[in-house]
Amino acid sequence: MRSDGLAFYIHPPKYKSHSWEQRKLGEVGTTYTGLSGKTKEDFGHGNGQFVTYMNVFSNPVGLPDMTEAVEIDDSQNKVLFGDVLFTTSSETPEEVGMSSVWLENAENTYLNSFCFGYRPTVEFNPYYLAYMLRSSSMRKKITFLAQGISRYNISKNKMMDIEIPIPKIEEQKQIGSYFRNLDNLITLHQRKYNKLQNVKKSMLEKMFPKNGSNIPEIRFA
């Protein structure tokens, strides 16, 4: 086992006899709409929050700090823990129908108007859902449904006809954990990379003489 926890086996013996079930999204969950009937005056204040389009578009797992304020409105659909959020339009077909799983328990959380929500009615590992829906095979299925010319849209009803692979819950957990660990490692190394870039930038300024000087600020002994 590698120290970073990323070692895995292809076709582990305990799962060899378990074929993955194929079910339509609409058979294992229900949908709901984002905010409706709002004007720009309704946003930017209030004790509620809504998940932004860019949060859904950019993150397999939604970020709690990428929300914006909105007034509480009990007539609107609320986003709950474990919901999957989908974008409904984009400038290119390859970017339509991007998904994000919401794993926060915050009250009075809503969804922006340019997305729709999906609530599973059977047990899923949320991290499995997050990464499976962004896999290359699923993205091809979703992209195929995109319609438009200058801007592309996707039908919620057609999305619900897409078949998804559903392994046993224990295998889902292992898959979800594996990709979650990968993302954590990527984030860690990205932070290290950013720090090293800052060090390099600083040293480029200090290890060469500035204009008007012939002595650098920092030099080797």
Language-model features, listed with the residues they occupy:
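Charged, alpha-helix-forming regions
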Residues: 2, 8-16, 204, 210-221
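Short, solvent-exposed loop/turn positions at domain surfaces
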Residues: 11-14, 37, 72-73, 148
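Non-catalytic DNA-recognition/assembly elements of restriction-modification systems
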Residues: 14-35, 221
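Sequence-specific dsDNA recognition surfaces
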Residues: 26-39, 54-84
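A short glycine-rich beta-alpha junction/loop motif
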Residues: 36-39, 109-114, 146-173
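Short, ligand-facing micro-motifs at secondary-structure edges
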Residues: 58-71, 84-111, 116, 127-131, ...
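Extracellular/lumenal glycan-associated surfaces
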Residues: 173-185, 189-192
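Extended intrinsically disordered, low-complexity coil regions enriched in Ser, Thr, Gly, Ala
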Residues: 186-201, 209-214
